[in-house]
Regions:
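Phosphate-end processing signature that detects enzymes handling 5′-triphosphorylated RNA
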Residues: 1-156
């Protein structure tokens, strides 16, 4: 399993010109949830995945496996009541060749916009100075994890 180092921000609105960036639809649901471990299935455009994530905060362990669409379809009903639908835009930021994943949520979470960026190491994550368009950082707030959003909706 590989570790990922991410920072997450909540935006007031999508960044101006976001439609000019590459994007894809995402539907994901949670098969099993625990406080620090999640098992999810995800459809990203035409590809389907099974992912296990463990940990909290900005350093998490993730294992993602591409699965056959038929397996996704078999698991999807198990996620009823624990799903999110969003459009993900890939937005480059700064001269460091960082790319933010800006998620514009749909359905029950319509209006929510969240941006995440993965960093190569803790030093890069610590050194990152966020641009003005990024909102409040919620990396360490478990209420903003996708699994929590799928279960409880947008935090107040």
């Amino acid at each position: 399993m590989s570790a990922e180092i991410e920072r997450k921000f909540v935006l007031d609105a999508p960044p101006q010109g976001i439609e000019e960036h590459p994007s894809e639809p995402i539907a994901q649901g949670y098969v099993a949830l625990d406080e620090d471990v999640e098992v999810r299935v995800r459809r990203r455009a035409e590809r389907t995945y099974l992912t296990i994530k463990a940990g909290s905060g900005r350093r998490r362990v993730e294992q993602e496996l591409e699965i056959e669409p038929e397996r996704f379809d078999a698991l999807w009903p198990l996620t009823e009541g624990r799903r999110i639908v969003k459009r993900r835009y890939l937005v480059p930021v700064g001269a460091d060749e960082l790319t933010f994943e800006v998620d514009v949520y749909e359905d029950a979470l319509a209006g929510l916009v969240v941006a995440e960026c993965e960093f190569p190491d803790d030093a890069a994550a610590d050194a990152f100075v966020s641009p003005d368009w990024l909102g409040r950082e919620v990396t360490d707030d478990p209420r903003w994890k996708n699994q929590a959003l799928a279960l409880h909706g947008r935090p107040e």
